[in-house]
Amino acid sequence: MKNDKLFLTGKILEIIHGDKYRVMLENNVEVDAHLAGKMKMKRTKILPGDVVEVEFSPYDLKLGRITQRK
């Protein structure tokens, strides 16, 4: 279960509120994503236009977790 995660690259379209973002993935699908815990702890700033890596659970492909800014 823990190793069944999907990783895709996307571009931040807008900040919804707080740590929630709207992301356009490389396959032209728009999803919502939130910051991973380590990124919150390090207070990483994410702005519209940034390219990020998004992690998905195979059970819910509409909500992702931003794990890295590229």
Swiss-Prot record:
Residues 1-70 form the S1-like domain. Keywords: Cytoplasm, Initiation factor, Protein biosynthesis, RNA-binding, rRNA-binding. Pfam families: eIF-1a. It is found in: Cytoplasm. One of its GO terms (cellular component) is cytosol. GO terms for molecular function: ribosome binding; rRNA binding; translation initiation factor activity. Transmembrane segments: none annotated. InterPro entries: NA-bd_OB-fold (IPR012340), RNA-binding_domain_S1_IF1 (IPR006196), TIF_IF1 (IPR004368). NCBIfam families: infA. PANTHER family: TRANSLATION INITIATION FACTOR IF-1, CHLOROPLASTIC (PTHR33370:SF1). Belongs to the IF-1 family. Component of the 30S ribosomal translation pre-initiation complex which assembles on the 30S ribosome in the order IF-2 and IF-3, IF-1 and N-formylmethionyl-tRNA(fMet); mRNA recruitment can occur at any time during PIC assembly. One of the essential components for the initiation of protein synthesis. Stabilizes the binding of IF-2 and IF-3 on the 30S subunit to which N-formylmethionyl-tRNA(fMet) subsequently binds. Helps modulate mRNA selection, yielding the 30S pre-initiation complex (PIC). Upon addition of the 50S ribosomal subunit IF-1, IF-2 and IF-3 are released leaving the mature 70S translation initiation complex. This is Translation initiation factor IF-1. The gene is infA.
